[in-house]
Each structure stands twice: as structure tokens, then as C-alpha cells.
């Protein structure tokens, strides 16, 4: 069972792909559920028996980074949580999924890069030799450029020394 958070355009695409890939059930969650459309509330979603959760809403996107409407810790048996939000790299939903021990928790940066790579193939009318490898490499480079390191500690505990060593390696 795939549980999709949100009802917009990305939901429609995600739902179509989930069905195409053989999902037994695809359920939709909304802040304002329409029972006639079979939509669930976030409270109901926790008890849906979902295997995979996909967030297609802007919840958790910068600057509202602490927002998370779904209690994934109360959803035993989750196999994966995917979030289309790419800024921050790890949304509150992804952080909570990792904390709950969900085996796969992935943010939206790789999806954003994949869209760009496949759009480039389309508009340039040529295929990249290894698009998946290209996507992984670009995503890794972007993460390296975006993420930072904060060293915290008491005076004279070695922050400067560690900072210099990191600067040499990064």
C-alpha cells in the first residue's frame, strides 16, 4: 500500500507511477479530506497499513522546516518514506522516519536532479551514457556544496584543529 500525502499535481503523477509499478492500493491523505473521493485525514493515515509514504506537499520546505503532519513513528511496518521536498535535504518527515528506523528515507533532491537530467536528454535529443550514475554524481556534488559542518565545544577542546583538518579534506 502506497500512502500519498497531498492532492495536487505531483500527487497525480506519483499515484499513476505507483499504480503502474503494481501498488496493491494507493491511498490519498489531505488536510481537508473529501470522503467522497476516498481521501484520508492524517490521523486516519497512521492506521492505513501503508508500506510506503510519499509526501507531495510543501510541508517541511524551507523556511517552515519543522513542519511534519504525519506520525511515522506510529506506523509499524513502513518500508520507505519519500519526500519530494528538496530544501532542506532532510525534511522533518525524513528525519522522523530515520529516527523510527524506516529502512529507506529519501528526500527530493535526487528527484529534482533526475528531472533536470531527463529534461536535458529530451531537449538536447540525446541520451546520456549512464543517466542514473550521472544523477547520483550530480546529487552528491550538490549535497557536498549545500551541507555544512558546525563544530561545537568548550574552549580549547580542539575545534580549530578539527576545523583545519576538515578544511584540508573537504
Regions found by a protein language model. Give the residues of each.
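NAD(P)-binding Rossmann-fold cofactor-contacting core
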Residues: 20-38
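Rossmann-like adenosine-cofactor binding region
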Residues: 37-105
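Adenosine-phosphate binding glycine-rich loop
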Residues: 84-147
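Hydrophobic positions on the alpha1 helix immediately C-terminal to the Walker A/P-loop
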Residues: 162
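Conserved S-adenosyl-L-methionine
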Residues: 20-25, 99-103, 169
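Glycine-rich adenosine-cofactor-binding loop
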Residues: 1-19, 23, 153-155
Amino acid at each position: 500500500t502506497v500512502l500519498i500525502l497531498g492532492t495536487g499535481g505531483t500527487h497525480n503523477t506519483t499515484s499513476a507511477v505507483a499504480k503502474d509499478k503494481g501498488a496493491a492500493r494507493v491511498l490519498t491523505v489531505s488536510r481537508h479530506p473529501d470522503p467522497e473521493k476516498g481521501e484520508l485525514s492524517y490521523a486516519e493515515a497512521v492506521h492505513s497499513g501503508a508500506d510506503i509514504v510519499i509526501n507531495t506537499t510543501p510541508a517541511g520546505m524551507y523556511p517552515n522546516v519543522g513542519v511534519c503532519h504525519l506520525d511515522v513513528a506510529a506506523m509499524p511496518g513502513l518500508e520507505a518514506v519519500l519526500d519530494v521536498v528538496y530544501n532542506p535535504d532532510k525534511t522533518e518527515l525524513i528525519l522522523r522516519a530515520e529516527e523510527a528506523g524506516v529502512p529507506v528515507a529519501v528526500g527530493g533532491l535526487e528527484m529534482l536532479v533526475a528531472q533536470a537530467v531527463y529534461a536535458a536528454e529530451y531537449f538536447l535529443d540525446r541520451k546520456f551514457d549512464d543517466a542514473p550514475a550521472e544523477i547520483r554524481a550530480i546529487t552528491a556534488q550538490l549535497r557536498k556544496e549545500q551541507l555544512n559542518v558546525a563544530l561545537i565545544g568548550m574552549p580549547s577542546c580542539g575545534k580549530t584543529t578539527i576545523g583545519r583538518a576538515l578544511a584540508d579534506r573537504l
